[in-house]
């Protein structure tokens, strides 16, 4: 018996050794540099993801190895503008998304190309120029509610968590646009159970990616998962189903300028969305359209407070050019507040809403990405956090410098930011699967920041001085951003 165990152990060790040797020295991807331990033993890459350090590790690997990094046997990450075009562009047939077997393929993020085109067509009106214009009054109503609640906080003179206020606002707002009713977060000053479940679920994302690579390990993980998590997931799904059904049966179903109205415009066509697809897409729109803007709003607020000169310029611009709060609208912010727009871009650069990679699978034939030969069936991606913080792409990359986005920085020969690689900055991705919500997200975020700065002076509390040091689990794991607010004294 002992001999059999020793033989089995020896065979396992030999297999591990041979596999590691193959991955390091023979594998067709061996010409791309990267951390040798991760390449030899891919479980280390997954452990990094489970710990929440994968994105900061990849940032470090790119700083060490350059514009292309191999971080697993068949995984490569890039940080060049060319890689965006090669991986996500529309000049060749789309590279398929890499998704885990547990992903919901009935939504616009994880769908195959054919269904993605259907979903995008169904949502096209919602994110068109006319659609965004029609949604603006509803968005402004929620921003007014946020400002009203923050005025109460300022009057109390107590510190407050801006991450929470931004999340309550964006989830109420996008929930209303997707489901036809809000979550009541701003009214109650607390997260609805649907929203709270999202926060708990993000930590599970790395485990889902283990499912296909290490199915036995994943079964162990499932066995130790608390039943309360699965109960919360079921309650979230049931809430989505009931709320969508309520919206479909409502008398305003065809007259309300929201996401569901857009999806229902094609209900009599042969490629209409099923009720399950309506539920899936409404749910993912709430998640993507709420969590990521809240990230950006929190990030911009933090970096402005950490950079007093930028805060002074942005606040001065808003208050000098906007004579009344009601003047702060989608169009006026874009047309009249160039420095604020630069602050939003710089916030997205230092704190991208999706810090990690959107992986694609290379085809069954070799291809080139950013000049590198890539063998078939390789998982490839641009890593946003690493790309935006690389000194090869941006001058002084670790500092919050909105001036780099102003027009003169791109044309003035004496500007230190003249050669910043702005084409690598693609926070909403590119190509046919680029984020459809960009047309709403940008004006929404800019208008919230502008109205908050118009109304309040901020101080960053000591406990949030290092707020930007965070773990990531697909999304940022945001700690509270504790600030003191003072209502602006108007002359």
From Swiss-Prot:
Its cofactor is heme. Disruption phenotype: Abolishes the production of 15-deoxyoxalicine B and accumulates decaturin A. Its EC number is 1.-.-.-. Heme binds at residue 435. The chain crosses the membrane at residues 5-27. Keywords: Heme, Iron, Membrane, Metal-binding, Monooxygenase, Oxidoreductase, Transmembrane, Transmembrane helix. Gene3D superfamilies: Cytochrome P450. One of its GO terms (molecular function) is monooxygenase activity. Its main location: membrane. It comes from the Eukaryota. InterPro entries: Cyt_P450, Cyt_P450_CS, Cyt_P450_E_grp-I, Cyt_P450_sf, Cytochrome_P450_monoxygenase. One of its GO terms (biological process) is mycotoxin biosynthetic process. Belongs to the cytochrome P450 family. Cytochrome P450 monooxygenase; part of the gene cluster that mediates the biosynthesis of 15-deoxyoxalicine B. The first step of the pathway is the synthesis of nicotinyl-CoA from nicotinic acid by the nicotinic acid-CoA ligase olcI. Nicotinyl-CoA is then a substrate of polyketide synthase olcA to produce 4-hydroxy-6-(3-pyridinyl)-2H-pyran-2-one (HPPO) which is further prenylated by the polyprenyl transferase olcH to yield geranylgeranyl-HPPO. Geranylgeranyl pyrophosphate is provided by the cluster-specific geranylgeranyl pyrophosphate synthase olcC. The 15-deoxyoxalicine B cluster is a rare cluster that contains its own geranylgeranyl pyrophosphate synthase (olcC), in contrast to other related clusters which rely on a FPP/GGPP synthase localized outside of the cluster. This is Cytochrome P450 monooxygenase olcB.
């Amino acid at each position: 018996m002992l001999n059999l165990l020793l033989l089995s152990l020896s065979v396992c060790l030999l297999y591990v050794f041979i596999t590691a040797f193959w991955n390091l020295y023979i594998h067709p991807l061996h010409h791309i540099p990267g951390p040798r331990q991760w390449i030899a033993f891919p479980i280390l890459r997954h452990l990094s993801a489970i710990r929440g350090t994968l994105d900061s590790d990849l940032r470090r690997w790119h700083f060490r190895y350059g514009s292309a990094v191999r971080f697993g046997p068949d995984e490569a990450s890039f940080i060049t503008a060319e890689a965006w075009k090669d991986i996500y562009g529309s000049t060749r047939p789309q590279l398929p998304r890499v998704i885990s077997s547990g992903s919901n393929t009935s939504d616009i993020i994880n769908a195959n190309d054919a269904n993605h085109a259907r979903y995008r067509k169904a949502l096209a009106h919602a994110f068109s120029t006319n659609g965004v214009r029609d949604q603006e009054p509803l968005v402004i109503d929620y921003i007014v509610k946020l400002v009203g609640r923050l005025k109460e906080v300022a009057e109390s003179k107590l510190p407050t968590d801006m991450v929470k206020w931004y999340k309550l606002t964006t989830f109420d707002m996008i929930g209303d646009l997707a489901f036809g009713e809000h979550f009541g977060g701003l009214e109650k000053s607390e997260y609805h159970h649907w929203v709270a479940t999202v926060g708990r679920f993000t930590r599970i994302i790395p485990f889902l990616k283990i499912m296909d690579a290490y199915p036995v390990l994943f079964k162990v993980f499932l066995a130790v998962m608390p039943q309360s998590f699965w109960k919360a997931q079921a309650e979230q799904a049931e809430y989505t189903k009931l709320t969508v059904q309520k919206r479909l049966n409502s008398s305003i179903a065809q007259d309300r300028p929201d996401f569901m109205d857009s999806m229902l415009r094609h209900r009599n066509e042969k490629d209409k969305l099923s009720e399950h697809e309506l539920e899936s897409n409404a749910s993912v729109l709430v998640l993507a359209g709420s969590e990521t803007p809240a990230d950006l709003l929190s990030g911009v607020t933090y970096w402005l407070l950490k950079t007093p000169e930028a805060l002074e310029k942005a606040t001065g611009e808003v208050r000098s050019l906007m004579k009344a709060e009601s003047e702060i609208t989608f169009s006026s912010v874009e047309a009249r507040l160039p420095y604020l727009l630069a602050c939003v871009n710089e916030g997205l650069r230092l704190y991208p809403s999706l810090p990690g990679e959107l992986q694609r699978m290379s085809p069954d034939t070799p291809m080139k990405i950013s000049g590198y030969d890539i063998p078939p069936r390789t998982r490839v991606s641009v890593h946003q956090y690493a790309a935006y913080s690389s000194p090869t792409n941006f001058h002084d990359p670790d500092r919050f410098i909105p001036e780099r986005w102003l027009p003169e920085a791109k044309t003035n020969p004496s500007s230190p930011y003249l050669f910043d690689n702005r084409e690598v900055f693609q926070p909403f991705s590119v190509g046919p699967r680029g984020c459809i919500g960009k047309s709403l997200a940008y004006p929404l975020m800019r208008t919230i920041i502008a109205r908050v700065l118009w109304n309040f002076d901020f101080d960053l509390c000591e406990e949030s001085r290092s707020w930007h040091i965070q773990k990531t689990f697909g999304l940022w794991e945001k700690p509270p951003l504790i600030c003191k607010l003072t209502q602006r004294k108007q002359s």
